[in-house]
Amino acid sequence: MASARRWARKAERCCCTFATYFPLAFVYGLTSWAVWVVVNIGSVSTKSSWIGTGSSIVGVALYVMLNWCYTTAVFTPPGSTTNDMGYGLLPTQNTPQATSFTVKSNGEFRFCKKCQARKPDRAHHCSTCRRCVLKMDHHCPWLATCIGLRNHKAFLLFLIYTSLFCFWSFAVSACWVWYEALNDQEYIDSFLPVNFIMLSVISGIIGLVVGAFTSWHIHLARCGQTTIECLEKTRYLSPLRKTYNSAHNPANEVPEAARHFVDFHANALPGITRPEEGEERREMPRSYPPDGSQPVQLSYAQREREQRQRRYEEYLDEQDSEKLPNVFDLGWKRNLLHLFGPTPALWFFPVSNTTGDGWTWEASSTWLEARDRLSAEREQQRAREVNAGWGSPDDIPDIPERPTGAGKHYSPSPNLAGPKTMSKADRVLGRDPNLYADATQDVPMQRLSPRGRSIDDELADLDTDDEDGFLDANNPDKAEGGKFSPSFTSDSHRRDDAEARALEVVTNGNWGRGGASGMLRKGSSQSTPTRTPSNLSRSGTPKFQDEGVD
């Protein structure tokens, strides 16, 4: 069984390896065959004047640039929030604070619970690569890797050179087929024109598909967008919130040891030591009243009101997010300079000189103006609602923050100072717990006897009985109205007597430490025959008459 499972895992790894490297072998093999056909067409005499050595040189140059860009795009890491071992990247110098223009679909900051690291703007988690990729465009199966910040330029150049190579191969092969194969019967019985015809068909089809794909990616690069940002709806931070959120969310704090390690090196790691996005729910920090008092626990009506207000705010945020333009569109010139680098001599070569670190992004001036305008409109709308009596001038009522870390699994302690929260039964039956509150039934911390009386009460009764008995026996004259206090009784003796009296829970007084078995022994001793002097032996021991067995 174990051997079969081991072979199954090996087969799975082999299949995954084949699926990973097959696209690479296919691209290298197909392009090599195409350039070989182009060179052969140039070496064959044709009626076309431009097909020859020059066409072969251009084809080889495009082939070299194509494979150079392809190799660079495949083997260049796209950039991630963590390293190869899964640890958060620690910079060697102080970096500026990361910006947060985008949020999750529920309006919260972006955080990856799989990588346990903050996801900056334009970063996404790839399930195939199992890491978060900075400025992720998409995961390309033909490259067997993700297209991100560091290899996006090489990928776009690969598409451009592939399209040019396909169009050039199609032009060379199609011209040869048009001038030679269709007008001359010399090549009918030869196998060489088959490759020429296949190249014209394959290069034409691939050129149309890859050319359209290349045009679309050039348009995205010109607009400052990625494939994910174009196909998916981007949720921006609410206009009423501060764009550069410098406050630390307790839910996003790093462990104590990691924070000490970062502080020791005097580095502030964006995304690890500062808040961001999360697939898990992370509450926004709430402010407390100016007087510093803690908010009381909300009632059911207040909680319903808060939920309605929150849903309404989320609806307005969704509408405002759709009205905002692309925050990363800085103009087509600056967008292309960001992708291809500031050096014009390196624009046509797959050298990674893309500007930026993937953590901080500059916002578009158009987006900032639109955000400020929407913020002013929201404030005016809220003021109109308050004046019309539809809302409260205050924000959503504050509720106590839930504990984070290991303490988030414990139930919060009840707030005794605030009003009582209605239970589910009270809400269903329409009862108010404040009207039918029972009196407190606090039990004092005293030592109680088995019949519910305290030991002090038993001692007081015992003292009274001992005092009365002593007066009756020794001083009958003072027993009627005199006062006497026995001072010779020790406290330990009185406590033992009180404990013995406390154990007498039945009225016959026969219940003692022996319990039920002790009472049975006493009853059996009372039912034994009466001892007479004749029944005593000389040694003084009693003699019992054996009645025998019936």
From Swiss-Prot:
Natural source organism: Gibberella zeae (strain ATCC MYA-4620 / CBS 123657 / FGSC 9075 / NRRL 31084 / PH-1) (Wheat head blight fungus)
Keyword Lipoprotein among record annotations: yes
Sequence segments annotated as region (Disordered): 272-304, 378-422, 434-550
Residue span(s) of domain DHHC: 110-160
Catalytic activity: L-cysteinyl-[protein] + hexadecanoyl-CoA = S-hexadecanoyl-L-cysteinyl-[protein] + CoA
Transmembrane annotation, as ranges: 22-42, 57-77, 154-174, 191-211
Domains as described in the record: The DHHC domain is required for palmitoyltransferase activity.
Compositionally skewed regions (Basic and acidic residues) per UniProt: 274-285, 491-502
EC number: 2.3.1.225
Keywords linked to the UniProt accession: Acyltransferase, Lipoprotein, Membrane, Palmitate, Transferase, Transmembrane, Transmembrane helix, Vacuole
Primary location recorded for the protein, binned into one broad class: membrane
Keyword Chaperone in annotation: no
Ranges per topology, Cytoplasmic: 1-21, 78-153, 212-550
Annotated protein name in UniProt: Palmitoyltransferase PFA3
